[in-house]
């Protein structure tokens, strides 16, 4: 299956999920999409300068029409970077924002960050009720021989352990950008909370997932700390 077909299959699966309700049931509320951006802290730079610049940038993005912008910073994992997120209702909302006004950043502005990445993702499950102090950010890509529906099923099987361990997790999948992957973000307020969550997750990994055929191609876990919400 080509990239384009997988992308269309993902949108189709979400559309079917929202329309396959009987007439006597209310359809579930549509979940937002999100723009995730990563701004690497270059060697020798002052993270505080980049942080101030990005805070002003995000305030401007909310004025442009994005919803609920927030920023987190690297704590454990890679790369050493700031991670920003802004939500929007759907791709048409995104188009109105992008066509309606220019970005706050000036084309002549000095670039304070190193490498940079933008990624549009679809939220598929919302478990967080607030922006937590810390976020466990998990990214998983599955074997390319799977079709998109099979990848979604594997992601559900794998990330269910995160849901059970940490309780408050959001789920996302790729919509547009640099990688075809599935994501979980789980919140916690202290490293004691993190340890408690990990202990629960590891029991699941050592139990029902120990022999599960998950077809994982690559995986990473990062810990991020809140800078702005």
Name each model-derived stretch.
Residues 22-229:
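Short S/T/G/P-rich N-terminal loop/turn motif that feeds into the first structured element of a domain
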Residues 3, 19-20:
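N-terminal compositionally biased, intrinsically disordered segments and leader/signal-like regions
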Residues 1-8:
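Bacterial N-terminal signal peptides that target proteins for export
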Residues 9-17:
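Bacterial N-terminal signal peptides
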